[in-house]
């Protein structure tokens, strides 16, 4: 039920945020609540920026404070702020594990990490925000490899694995090949990083 409550974000934002078949938005594409079936209101410019910010926040399952910190790091780095922002988010350990398709959701990725079921280059890491470096190998511990959720996720192949990850489904491991640009990330929904930059630049 906890995951179902998290999926309410899709209905609030008007998109199937994670692109999953069980997403309630697929059958009830209107906002949650008593008057939800009245549809979505046309948002203001700020409303669009705020919604874009919310999409990223929910998609990566991070707090507003964490999002702002990621933006500040991206802004200070050389290069395109949008690419830097997305690159930092995609480099998080929870994102790498989720995008590998070895787990069904970003929430299950965070749970496995916090329960110390995940190795980075052979060492246990239990921090979801840990930044994985190019060339690093993320592996599930032996006990986690046979979890029903892991086996089901691999068999379903519901999540498209991006080409900047190299996944070994036998070993239950994933190698980070390169930091992606915004345009390379196969988001299931439209993610407008330019509006997020505008939101934080107000």
Curated annotation (Swiss-Prot):
Superkingdom as given in the UniProt entry: Bacteria
Keyword Chaperone among UniProt keywords: no
The S4 RNA-binding domain, residue ranges: 91-168
Pfam families (UniProt xref): Ribosomal_S4 (PF00163), S4 (PF01479)
Keyword presence, Ribosomal protein: yes
Protein name: Small ribosomal subunit protein uS4
GO cellular component: small ribosomal subunit
Natural source organism: Ehrlichia canis (strain Jake)
Function: One of the primary rRNA binding proteins, it binds directly to 16S rRNA where it nucleates assembly of the body of the 30S subunit. With S5 and S12 plays an important role in translational accuracy.
Gene3D superfamilies, per database record: Ribosomal Protein S4 Delta 41, Chain A, domain 1, RNA-binding S4 domain
Record-linked HAMAP family: Ribosomal_uS4_B
